[in-house]
Swiss-Prot record:
It is found in: Nucleus; Cytoplasm. The modification Phosphoserine is found at residues 25, 67-68, 71, 76, 78, 94, 313, 317, 457. The modification N-acetylmethionine is found at residue 1. Residues 163-284, 326-449 form the MI domain. Expressed ubiquitously. Highyly expressed in thymus and liver. Moderately expressed in brain, kidney and spleen; weakly in lung and heart. Expression is up- or down-regulated in response to apoptosis inducers. Regulated by many programmed cell death-inducing stimuli. The lineage of its organism: Eukaryota, Metazoa, Chordata, Craniata, Vertebrata. Belongs to the PDCD4 family. GO terms for molecular function: RNA binding. A motif (Phosphodegron) lies at residues 70-76. Residues 1-37, 58-128 are annotated as: Disordered. Its main location: nucleus. This is Programmed cell death protein 4. Residues 1-23 have a biased composition (Polar residues).
């Protein structure tokens, strides 16, 4: 046994200086160093004692290192540590044991936000919570009597001239599409027109001058419905005064502006939004030629209304609102006037004024019937030229042209009862239209032809008489 201890001391020679660093720290190390030095110098200490001291010192260092982490259980650790030191067994501090520990390691948590109140973070109270009415403290130094019972209202600034035109132009253009005067009135009430109320009729009439007859009729209805709700009769009078003043400029874009403005004035007087003495107030005071022409037109229309003509028919009823019988009469008059004057452009203009592109097949039908009923070549050639012009200008579409010819093909047996030579005339006219490019080859081939009668004078040789039947 003594031999083994001597070998251990020889293998692990102990340096007194280094022993103090490896065994202890602080005051305990200093005290232990002095004792060990004395013991070593006395040559009576054993190797097992030195190994046990090393183990105990190492266990103490581990306990001190983990003391900051295990601050919450310092008493138990210190107790365990003292027991470990006495027993010579180290406290298990393996990494696996620390992973299974669910307590905080740094005292700051995992860095997640804390729950902020009953409704959670960023939520004001629980769902469905009703807040009390905030009571005003009279003793508050910032209390103001004017703040009690305040009623807040949205203030809309009045429109200037530029904003007025930009805002109202799309409103009136949309009105030409839907025709609802109530919707326009509601939109105008939301705007602060101020002194620009008289500009509404001016802008509406200016846009209607560039439109169709149906647009002018809708404008007259709009002015009649807005008067008394959005604007007054004085505003209407101011607007027509401005229109008469601006007629020279309006006539540059619309040459018929004086006559159209005169019709607007006559319609306004008939609707009761202009006084009957409005035209008389301008007598002898007008120097502008266009304004005088407008007033003269209004005077003529008003005088005609006294004889029985209604003032609400100055624009007629445009588009599909017209009855079919009325459209048939208008087209018949259009063709008769064309055969008398021969003016293709005027006939085309009158057809567009009817605003019934879905009814153009009636013109094709009536025109061909006139050709079948005519006795000379002039009507044949004039109707051919008219259809050719309307086809090239795309006034009459291919569908309307086809439908008009198909109506003739279906009714030719009845027409032939009144016009005996209708089949031969129709075949000739259809062939001429095909040569002019008005109809297609398929439509030409659909033209019906009546079987020719066999005359008694025809012999077995099959010779035909020179005249055709």
């Amino acid at each position: 046994m003594d031999i083994e201890n001597e070998q251990t001391l020889n293998v692990n020679p102990t340096d007194p200086d280094n022993l103090s660093d490896s065994l202890f720290s602080g005051d305990e190390e200093n005290a232990g160093t002095e004792e060990i030095k004395n013991e070593i110098n006395g040559n009576w200490i054993s190797a097992s004692t030195i190994n046990e001291a090393r183990i105990n010192a190492k266990a103490k260092r581990r306990l001190r290192k983990n003391s900051s982490r295990d601050s919450g259980r310092g008493d138990s650790v210190s107790d365990n540590g003292s027991e470990a030191v006495r027993s010579g067994v180290a406290v298990p501090t393996s990494p696996k044991g620390r992973l299974l520990d669910r307590r905080s390691r740094s005292g700051k948590g995992r860095g997640l936000p804390k729950k902020g109140g009953a409704g959670g973070k960023g939520v004001w109270g629980t769902p469905g919570q009703v807040y009390d009415v905030e009571e005003v403290d009279v003793k508050d130094p910032n209390y103001d009597d004017d703040q009690e019972n305040c009623v807040y209202e949205t203030v809309v600034l009045p429109l200037d001239e530029t904003a007025f035109e930009k805002t109202l132009t799309p409103i009136i253009q949309e009105y030409f599409e839907h025709g609802d005067t109530n919707e326009v009135a509601e939109m105008l009430r939301d705007l602060n027109l101020g002194e620009m109320k008289s500009g509404v009729p001016v802008l509406a009439v200016s846009l209607a001058l560039e439109g169709k007859a149906s647009h002018r009729e809708m404008t007259s209805k709009l002015l009649s419905d807005l008067c008394g709700t959005v604007m007054s009769t004085n505003d209407v009078e101011k607007s027509f005064d401005k229109l008469l003043k601006d007629l020279p400029e309006l006539a540059l874009d619309t040459p018929r502006a004086p006559q159209l403005v005169g019709q607007f004035i006559a319609r306004a007087v008939g609707d009761g939004i202009l006084c009957n003495t409005y035209i008389d107030s301008y007598k002898g005071t007008v120097d502008c030629v266009q304004a005088r022409a407008a007033l003269d037109k209004a005077t003529v229309l008003l005088s005609m209304s006294k004889g029985g003509k209604r003032k609400d028919s100055v624009w007629g009823s445009g588009g599909g609102q017209q009855p079919v019988n009325h459209l048939v009469k208008e087209i018949d008059m259009l063709l008769k006037e064309y055969l008398l004057s021969g003016d293709i452009s005027e006939a085309e203009h009158c057809l567009k004024e009817l605003e019934v592109p879905h009814f153009h097949h009636e013109l094709v039908y009536e025109a061909i019937v006139m050709v079948l009923e005519s006795t000379g070549e002039s009507a044949f050639k004039m109707i051919l030229d008219l259809l050719k012009s309307l086809w090239k200008s795309s006034t009459i579409t291919i569908d309307q042209m086809k439908r008009g010819y198909e109506r003739i093909y279906n009714e030719i047996p009845d027409i032939n009862l009144d016009v005996p030579h209708s089949y031969s005339v129709l075949e000739r006219f259809v062939e001429e239209c095909f040569q002019a490019g008005i109809i297609s080859k398929q439509l030409r081939d659909l033209c019906p032809s009546r079987g020719r009668k066999r005359f008694v004078s025809e012999g077995d040789g099959g010779r035909l008489k020179p005249e055709s039947y």
